[in-house]
Structure formats: structure tokens, C-alpha cells
Amino acid sequence: MNRRKSREVAMRLLFQTTLNGENLEEALENLKDVRESEDKEKDYESVDLKDVDIDYVKRIIKGIEKNKEEIDGKIKGNLKNWKIERLSKVDLSILRLCTYELKFEEDIPKRVSVNEAIELAKKYSGEKSATFINGVLGKMI
């Protein structure tokens, strides 16, 4: 199983639910259905779902949902001249994912989590966002 791909899927699910208010349980169930079907939905075309650790994705998503206030508080405390409400939904999803890993996933080296977040930002948000996310997360470690 590939942690990088699993993180990417988790970030996409977070983004999806943040953007359209979809229930996380429904999003996870949809992911499971897509993974088991032969035809891939557009949302997941660039990720081979066979390599995704669904249990890890579920743990991350449920952990973020359970600790959302604490995670958002940590993010807010490390934003300089920004409000969390002004962040793009992609950047917020990446920050929530990495903040959760930094705080609750002790088996993952902090630098690995931050580097993965930066790579997600480069892929889904852009170079400026990657620099911004690096700065915010750098204050947390």
C-alpha cells in the first residue's frame, strides 16, 4: 500500500466534503465502491486505487472529523495575517491533513508529513501555496 497515494485520496475527500458539504461517511463509502468497480470516476483517475490503504484513509478522515476544532485551532494559531476562512479549500484540506498527522500519527516523521503536504500543494494548488503551507506547518514542528 502506498501512503503517498493514500494521503492524496484523503486530501481529495476532505476537499470534496469541505466544498460541497457531503457527509464524510458517504464519501468514504463512495470511495470504497469506486475502488471495487472496474470503471474509475473522474475524481480518482490519476490515482490507482488498488495502491490505496483504505484503512489509513478512513483513520485520517475520521480523526480529522473527530478533532476538527483542535486541528483548526492549531492552524489558526499559526496563520500570520490570514484568517482560516480566507484559505482556499484545497489549502485548508492539505493543512488539516498534515496537522492531523503531526499531532496524532506518531509513527510518521514530522518532516515526512510536511514534505508530503508541500508536494500535494504543488500538485493541486501551486507554488505560492506550497510556500505558504510550508511556512504554516514549519511553525508547528
Swiss-Prot record:
Q: Which UniProt keywords apply?
A: RNA-binding, Transcription, Transcription antitermination, Transcription regulation
Indicate whether Protein transport appears among the record's keywords: no
* Entry GO terms, CC: cytosol
Gene Ontology molecular function? RNA binding
Gene3D superfamilies hit by this protein: NusB-like (1.10.940.10)
Q: Superkingdom of the source?
A: Bacteria
Indicate yes or no for the key word Transcription: yes
Q: Which InterPro entries match?
A: NusB-like_sf (IPR035926), NusB_fam (IPR011605), NusB_RsmB_TIM44 (IPR006027)
Any Pfam family hit: NusB
Which Gene Ontology biological process is one annotated for this entry? Answer: DNA-templated transcription termination
Describe the family membership recorded for this protein in Swiss-Prot or TrEMBL.
Belongs to the NusB family.
Biological function: Involved in transcription antitermination. Required for transcription of ribosomal RNA (rRNA) genes. Binds specifically to the boxA antiterminator sequence of the ribosomal RNA (rrn) operons.
Q: What is this protein called?
A: Transcription antitermination protein NusB
Q: Which organism is it from?
A: Clostridium botulinum (strain Loch Maree / Type A3)
Lineage, opening ranks: Bacteria, Bacillati, Bacillota, Clostridia, Eubacteriales
